[in-house]
Amino acid sequence: MQAKAVLRHTPTSPRKMRIVAGLIRGKQVDQAKAILMNSTKAASRNVMQTLKSAVANYSQKNPDTRAGDNDLFIKEIFVDEGPTIKRMLPAPMGRAYRIRKRSNHLTIIVDTVNPVS
């Protein structure tokens, strides 16, 4: 049985978030938490929050199973592009430059390493 957690409208560019997501893709949850704790990327805090939420969703969805962090692994993790906010920056000679403030949606799906019966 798998569980999912989604973090929407994160004010980070999808490119930066995908770097962190690639670090933990396919890893066990305890290994992924260790990697995220030692990561210097700012996006790792958001990924850690969502990962903890996915694990909590799994335990809520399956109250009869006792799956710890070493029993779960990250089955899927992907980052989609969110809405882009456009701003104008004054430029020389009466012009204006467009600034695009990007956002993203993060989805994490966790599952058990060995199916528990």
Curated annotation (Swiss-Prot):
Pfam family, one: Ribosomal_L22
Top-level division of the source organism's lineage: Bacteria
Keyword field: Ribonucleoprotein, Ribosomal protein, RNA-binding, rRNA-binding
GO molecular function term, any single one: structural constituent of ribosome
InterPro entries in alphabetical order: Ribosomal_uL22, Ribosomal_uL22_bac/chlpt-type, Ribosomal_uL22_bac/org-type, Ribosomal_uL22_sf
SS bond partners: none
A single GO BP: translation
Gene3D superfamilies: Ribosomal protein L22/L17 (3.90.470.10)
GO CC term, one of those recorded: cytosolic large ribosomal subunit
Subunit details: Part of the 50S ribosomal subunit.
Function, as annotated: This protein binds specifically to 23S rRNA; its binding is stimulated by other ribosomal proteins, e.g. L4, L17, and L20. It is important during the early stages of 50S assembly. It makes multiple contacts with different domains of the 23S rRNA in the assembled 50S subunit and ribosome.
Family of this protein: Belongs to the universal ribosomal protein uL22 family.
Protein name as it appears in the record: Large ribosomal subunit protein uL22
